[in-house]
């Protein structure tokens, strides 16, 4: 969300596509989005977040409806599948920032076509490596410094998408 806010120069109209209501990962992402948006009072969430069940077709249908009713500058999606649906609905080079999470090959196609200027990559491999490292420490009787493990994130856009395919 921070990168989206920067791309919008701190102002604009956004909408958010979420996974299933009650999903822990989605709830944490939404909490993070809301915390960041507090720092950007000129960014308005013009429609309530839509539960698209992590589904591409549902996201596409939702965004098609939104685009007929709202002037959107960005659509933030809690996964790349929904970002693909949002990109399909918005069309190539619409100027709408579409952000997704996961780093999937389908989403990479959107970035090669310049449908969206940003995508967030988080990899299961990095999560697994960090988790294994923590587990090994615990098995050795060591104490972890924290209850949270924070992983580095990489922003991907049309300028570097080929590096991540």
What are the language-model segments listed below?
Residues 1-165:
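A residue-level marker of the well-folded mature domains of exported/periplasmic proteins
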């Amino acid at each position: 969300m921070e990168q989206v806010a920067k791309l919008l120069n701190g102002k604009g109209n956004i909408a958010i596509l979420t996974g299933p209501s009650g999903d822990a990962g989605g709830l944490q992402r939404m909490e993070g989005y809301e915390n960041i948006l507090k720092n950007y009072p000129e960014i308005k969430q013009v429609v309530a977040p839509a539960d698209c069940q992590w589904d591409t077709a549902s996201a596409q249908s939702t965004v098609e409806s939104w685009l007929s009713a709202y002037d959107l500058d960005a659509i933030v999606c809690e996964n790349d599948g929904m970002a693909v649906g949002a990109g399909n609905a918005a069309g190539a080079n619409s100027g709408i920032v579409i952000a997704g999470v996961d780093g999937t090959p389908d989403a990479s196609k959107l970035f090669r076509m310049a449908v969206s200027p940003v995508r967030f990559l988080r990899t299961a491999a990095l999560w697994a490596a960090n988790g294994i490292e923590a587990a090994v420490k615990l098995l050795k009787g060591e104490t972890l410094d924290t209850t949270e493990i924070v992983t580095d994130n990489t922003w991907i856009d049309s300028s570097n998408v080929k590096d991540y395919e």
